[in-house]
A protein has these predicted regions:
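Conserved non-catalytic scaffold segment of RNase H-like nuclease domains
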Residues: 1-108
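Conserved small/polar residues in nucleotide/adenosyl-binding loops
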Residues: 120-126
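A short, structured active-site edge motif that brings together acidic residues
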Residues: 107-117
């Protein structure tokens, strides 16, 4: 089973980033079983650059719940699955840190789509 994941984060210092949006698609190898997405209040200001990049403003997040509210749901979605995503090591690190702040230990195998695309370009014939 696979959990395709994409996080948007607040930006800022390394290991201080907070999740502002979570999107997860659960795939069993044949079909999508479940999808989930939500905005998250990071309780810190989102960098201006991130606001421009994502279109998510601080005002959009003020009334949202914090990650702690979503932690168990997110864990239930991703546990015992391989995490897949674009630059997934970043998302994995941030997710792991957020779960740790909720006193939840989490480990997973990962597949990075950047590496997969690079490999595909090397192995597929060109026209």
């Amino acid at each position: 089973m696979y959990a395709f994941i994409d996080l948007e984060t607040s930006g800022g210092k390394f290991n201080k980033e907070k999740i502002i949006e979570i999107a997860i698609i659960i795939y069993n190898g044949k079909k999508i079983i479940e999808s989930y997405s939500t905005l998250v209040n990071p309780c810190i200001k989102v960098d201006f650059y991130v606001q421009k990049l994502t279109g998510i403003k601080n005002s959009d997040l003020e009334k949202e719940n914090t990650f702690n509210h979503y932690a168990k749901k997110v864990l239930n979605l991703v546990k015992d699955k391989i995490l897949v995503g674009h630059n997934v090591e970043y998302d994995y690190r941030v997710l792991k840190n957020e779960l740790k702040s909720c006193k939840i230990n989490y480990n997973s195998k990962t597949i990075c789509t950047i590496e997969t695309v690079s490999y595909t370009h090397l192995t597929l014939p060109t026209r």
